[in-house]
Amino acid sequence: MACITSFVTTFGQRAFRRPLTTDEITRYSAVAAQAAKDTNDVWQGLEAIASAFLQSPHFLYLTEVGAPDPQNTARYRYTAYEMASRLSYFLTNDTPDDALIAAAASGALLTPAGVEA
């Protein structure tokens, strides 16, 4: 079960371009565990999860909902992970690499100076 949870966490972050919530990790891990149990093959469980991730709207669409701006709650601004996705697709036409994900996780992409770096 630990390897399934590790796969869900790692693959899910790459597929969704953001960290998964605890609820998402629990749901996807349960689906993988059930598929592995039903087929008696852990690889079938991982295949079911990969298929579920690749069919999710979070993978298929680039969502930019944003979060309330702390200085002006009537406005919204991109979250750090949304900014990482926006930059990566603009510059490389691909998902964020490890450096952009790390910058998003540290909060560096929430400032103009961090985006320019």
Annotate each PLM feature.
Residues M1-A117:
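Composition-driven recognition of low-complexity segments enriched
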